[in-house]
Amino acid sequence: MKKKVIDFIKENSMIKSGDKVLVALSGGPDSVCLLHILSELRELLHIEVYAAHVNHCLRGESALKDEAYVEELCKNLNIKCFVKRVDINKISEEQNISTEMAGREERYKFFEELKNEYSLDKIAIAHNANDQAETLIMRALRGTGIEGLVGIKPVRDGIFIRPILILRRKEIEEYCEINNLNPRIDETNLEEIYSRNKIRLKAIPFIEDNFNPDIVATLNRLAYSCSKDVEFIQEEVEKRFPKLCIKENHSILIKEEAFNEKEALLTRIIKKALFEVSSKHNNFELKHIQDIIALKDKGTGKQINITNGVIALNEYGDIRIKLVDSKKAKENKVLNLENIKDELDKNQKVVIEDDILGNYELIVEDLKKGEKFSKDRFIKSFDYDKISNIDIRFRQNGDKIIPLGMKSSKKLKDIFINNKIPKEERDFIPLVLFNNEIAWIVGSNVSETFKVTNKTKKVIKITFKGKEN
């Protein structure tokens, strides 16, 4: 089995002579097997091996036993072990993310700290062939493209390596037994409460029994095949990108001729352009790419907001992708109601258009008895007579609102957390203010102060039309 791992390491150029390799060590069978194999191969590969363990403080006594086990194991193998305790529940609550996500972020943060402090070259993660199969099934069920079917990569960013991705879970368990390693077992892995656990414990055994007894190997071959196709496609993108795109003024101009390319190439060129202008890659979706393709046919000057301050602008058939300057993005866009009072009284309608904050339609009308208001979260009505001026802007430090039905104010930050609005989106949600007080978090909460009551005579209905002009 060691030869199998050595061959896999060499095939994927994971390790070179003299490398310092840090093993992410949970204490479970996979990471223990990985650590033991690399410790056995130290002299052959001419490498130094270290280990890092993060105690998430989630499983009480069991977590402490895991910690003690990895320290003893590393001592026996003469491997330096770094241990860190983190209150994952606390971090999860503070950041409004799952414990699983919080745990992953803290682990990788710890690995990065150790890498920098000790000049480590590689970080070895103990994913195996079964993990790969589970990942492909999960992604297929959620919906994915060919890139998603590549699954877990043997090497990522030239730093993160997965030397036992070639091994089946059964092989790993047998290795641990033969070498009397007695790894720790995380009991939560046996509970059918997570999607991955259900796939591991139910779906894969069912497929093996009824359709394909070698489904794990089959899915790993699929991942390998897709990885080769993606490599080829990406090479073509890298060749064509400099000819079809121009980098200028902190933006990317996609030439009109790029839109004549095959869709498989065009979508990836657009994706690369988005990645070039923004570091928040995980927020770009297929819909954003499709919107950019559609923008090409909407005429010069037309613009759409993508996400995280990234906008796309049609410039005579070319499409410019750029990140809106943060100062400009947060600049207050003020509309003083007194200046448009005559227009509202005459036409009962005013349209506001703004490149950054979006487009709005304001309609003033008499309140009809028994009138039912729209349930659309982008259409809200307020008491017109309570309003003297209107501001529309993005959030600022210390912003508060008195939510509908409440008597006291609440911080916008807390509302965003309660509404599970991602951090990266919060700075780009428009706010409508009346009399310098927040009346509406567009798409979300409205204020108690300006609500329509039985004493209301006139209402102002505001419709958010989106951020395309």
Curated annotation (Swiss-Prot):
CDD domains: TilS_N (cd01992)
Keywords: ATP-binding, Cytoplasm, Ligase, Nucleotide-binding, tRNA processing
Family designation: Belongs to the tRNA(Ile)-lysidine synthase family.
Stored PANTHER family: TRNA(ILE)-LYSIDINE SYNTHASE-RELATED
Subcellular location: Cytoplasm
Annotated protein name in UniProt: tRNA(Ile)-lysidine synthase
Domain-related comment: The N-terminal region contains the highly conserved SGGXDS motif, predicted to be a P-loop motif involved in ATP binding.
Organism this protein belongs to: Clostridium perfringens (strain 13 / Type A)
SUPFAM superfamilies hit by this protein: Adenine nucleotide alpha hydrolases-like (SSF52402), MesJ substrate recognition domain-like (SSF82829), PheT/TilS domain (SSF56037)
Enzyme class: ligase
A molecular function (GO) term: ATP binding
Keyword rRNA processing set for record: no
GO biological process, one term: tRNA modification
Annotated ATP binding sites: S26, G27, G28, P29, D30, S31
Gene behind the chain: tilS
